[in-house]
UniProtKB/Swiss-Prot annotation:
It comes from the Eukaryota. Processed by the macrocyclase-peptidase enzyme POPB to yield a toxic cyclic heptapeptide. POPB first removes 10 residues from the N-terminus. Conformational trapping of the remaining peptide forces the enzyme to release this intermediate rather than proceed to macrocyclization. The enzyme rebinds the remaining peptide in a different conformation and catalyzes macrocyclization of the N-terminal 7 residues. Keywords: Toxin. There is a cross-link at V11-P17 (Cyclopeptide (Val-Pro)). InterPro entries: Amanitin/phalloidin. Coiled coil: none annotated. GO terms for molecular function: toxin activity. Probable toxin that belongs to the MSDIN-like toxin family responsible for a large number of food poisoning cases and deaths. Belongs to the MSDIN fungal toxin family. This is MSDIN-like toxin proprotein 4. Residues 1-10, 18-34 form a propeptide.
């Protein structure tokens, strides 16, 4: 993980009420989009 991803991680957790596999999937998709 880069510093950018580490910084975005808490943002994703706060943005998504469901913390778990769904968030991991969103993070994976986000990295794919970037």
């Amino acid at each position: 993980m880069s510093d950018i991803n580490a910084t975005r991680l808490p943002v994703w957790i706060g943005y998504s009420p469901c913390v778990g596999d769904d968030c991991i999937a969103l993070l994976t998709r986000g990295e794919g989009l970037c």
